Amino acid sequence: MQKFAPNKQISAFLLSNLIFFFYLCNNQTYQIMNSNLKSFCIFIIYMLGAIACFAFFQFCYPYHLYYQEQNQLFLASWDYLTTYLEKPGWLACMAGDFLTQFYLYRFMGATILTLCILLAGHNIKCAVRKADIKGTWLPNLAAFVVMTLLVCFSFDYDYRLSSILAIAGGASVFCISTTILVSTRKLINKIEKMDENNPTLHRMGLPIWISTFSITISIFVCHWFFGYGVWIYGALVFIGNLMNIMKAGTYYCLTALVITFFLLMLCKRLYFCDFQTIYTYPGIGKLVKPQLDQERTLAVDCEYYFGNYNRVINMVEKDK
């Protein structure tokens, strides 16, 4: 009996390890399946939201989009394009006005608007992840809240597509600047590892100065390209620094953020506009409910413009 005892111990040991191995495999498989299920559910939510947005603006609100196309001019001439430089956010305004011209075609208006809102939500989600905000649902929740607000803003006939692109642009500037900043810090760490006994760059505070310089430059660039989208960039920088408040140089970054936002007031002489326009152009938007009564008025106006006089008569008689 003593001869076979070690074999029994070895068998028990192998069996316990085999059970533990299967447990790990099943646990990893469950985690992967759970992660895939979450991603699939999030994708379904985005798709349903996009379909609902497209369907509403295409079938219930199309004349608001036609009205914007009729009242928004875009000319492919150098003299006209240079006029965009007279206000902040020239890139967002130029792209938004260009895309608005396609609202004239059927299904194009609702499609462009929905895609731009999805683009803004995607950029917000990526930017929130870059800001070191923990949690799987928080980036998607932030994106969903922003997209919902943009849909509500779009109920207003005066809300321009460029305002949506300004938000998307502000988030994209944060993503790009953060990626460049992280790459620069990694390069500094590699340089210092070559000379571990003499970490000169960190003693000089070079990473901190690079961060503050990056924030200052990014704010001016974001404001020039995307106007009030700079508020999105500033909010993401502020939240990102709060999440890492105990790290060295955080207070310097927050100070640079506040000072640079005040320095934007100097652009008043550059653009010849008031302070409100400097910080809110091309337009923040306001929460309004669907203006269905105004939609009927715009429907009559647009159909008359298109030459559909019989349809105009039917609309007017139907409202009586």
Language-model segments: what does each one mean?
Residues 42-65, 222, 260-269:
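Transmembrane signal-anchor helices characteristic of membrane glycosylation enzymes that use polyprenol
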Residues 56-115, 296:
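Membrane-interface coil-to-helix junctions
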Residues 67-70, 85, 89, 113, ...:
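Membrane-interface micro-motifs in multi-pass membrane enzymes
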Residues 272-320:
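Soluble catalytic regions of membrane-associated enzymes that act on cell-envelope
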